Every structure is written in structure tokens, then in C-alpha cells.
């Protein structure tokens, strides 16, 4: 499980190691960002609520944003039936899944990045409207509250150098999978 604050590089990292690990994509009701392709399974509110009512998610998270309520769900069946699953989560999602599947069954990695870098990345990946800027700043501020339980993680790594970080993650995962 890869966790980290907004724009710390989680998706980039997962794409860089996807040849050995299989990404489990969360479902979401949020709109696609400009240039975003397949990072999530995008569904309507109605589709999400139907899947949730059928207990198809092991983890559900709700985020109140400048744009309204966004829903995220981790598909249970896909997670359980995927060999070497790789999943991007927030801290509460990690804790939920650890409680359900057992902490010893999960390798958890927290990715950290400087707040200035995260703000720069966020502003450059989204259209720079006043509403987007408010939402980005809200998320970055909110992350300071949502990422405090360092004891949940097996590893905590800095994303100062992407190539070095990917090497470290591959090394960690190979050690834990062998």
C-alpha cells in the first residue's frame, strides 16, 4: 500500500514499478483531471452507491471539496484476487484495510514530499482557476491533519529523487515478497 499527502508523487511511483506489481484502482465519483487517463475507475454517484450497497468495497472514503462530495472506494474482490497488489490510499484507508486484512498481511509505505513541492505540482497539474487553487490549498492543509499516524507504516520514504525512491521501493518490496 502506497500512502502520501496530495501531490507527493504516489501515482508516478506506482506507474514506475507497475511491471512487477499490479495496481488496484480505486473507484471514484470525482471528475477526471486534465490529461488524466486510467488512474481511477470513474463512476457516477449512482453507480458508486449501488456498488457500496452491494458491499463491493473493502474501504470507502468521502471527501468534502470545493466542488462537493467526492467518493472513493477500494474494490474488495479485485484486491483479494490480484497477485502482488499495489494500492494508493490515504492514511484512514490504510488503517481500515489493515484492520480488516491484518497489518502483517500488508506492506505499507508512506511517501513524503516538501509542502512547497506538493503545492507546485498540484498547481501545475490542474487548471489554475480560483476554485481549483482554493481546493488545492484546502487539501494540502487538510493533509497535515490526515497523515499523523506514522506507526501504521512499515516504511517512510522521502520523494526527493524519483529514480532513487523507485529503487528503494523495489528493494523493499522484493525483500518483503521473497
Give the ranges of each region predicted by the language model.
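Small-molecule kinase domains that catalyze NTP-dependent phosphoryl transfer to phosphate-bearing small molecules
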Residues: 127-172
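P-loop (Walker A) phosphate-binding loop of NTP-binding proteins
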Residues: 5
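Conserved phosphate-donor/acceptor-positioning beta-strand/loop module used by diverse small-molecule
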Residues: 84-91, 101-124, 158
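Post-Walker A helix-loop "phosphate-sensing" segment adjacent to the P-loop in P-loop NTPases
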Residues: 19-26, 45
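Conserved lysine of the Walker
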Residues: 10
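ATP-dependent small-molecule kinase phosphotransfer cores
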Residues: 28-85, 90-93
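Post-Walker A alpha-helix
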Residues: 13-14
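Hydrophobic anchor at the beta1->P-loop junction of P-loop NTPases
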Residues: 2
